[in-house]
Amino acid sequence: VRNAVQFKNLGASHFTSHSKVTEDKSVNWVESHDNFANGEANIPQELSDEWIKYGWAGVTAQKNGMSLFFDRPYKDGGTYGTGGVGTYGNGSGPFTENSKLGDAGSDLWKDPEVAAVNHFRNAMVGEASNVSNCGDDNCLMVERYAGSAAQDGMMVANANGSDKNLAGQSTKLAN
């Protein structure tokens, strides 16, 4: 998922491949403390809040797996304490040395879009899910359905930069 959102790709296969673990036993995240702190190929630093939210929507709206949201340290982007030269080679890194243990981190976890996906997941507990793209790899659709219009729902993450017309889009939702 992290690699997909780094390259601005919401292809459904990135959100449904659970190799070596069954979906009901998977733990999903966009980034973790380890990828963030260890500076794997600069991926954490390159992820904007917008793309973290797209990834979060894709992993959290589904039926199976537990989703974890990493709360980045406050004002990330500083050095690792290596004499001013961070692991990234330019003096920047994920820690500013302004944060102390127990300090609040980023407020992104409180974002209304993050909260909406969390509410969607909670409202759809136990319902089947289907993950697909809505026309291209910049529009991800997660359907949750029980066969009743009153119980069915859909989450759409649209990274196209403009409104997406979903008319005629095939779904598993009840009419």
Named regions from a protein language model:
Residues 1-175:
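Active-site-proximal helices and loops of the catalytic beta/alpha 8
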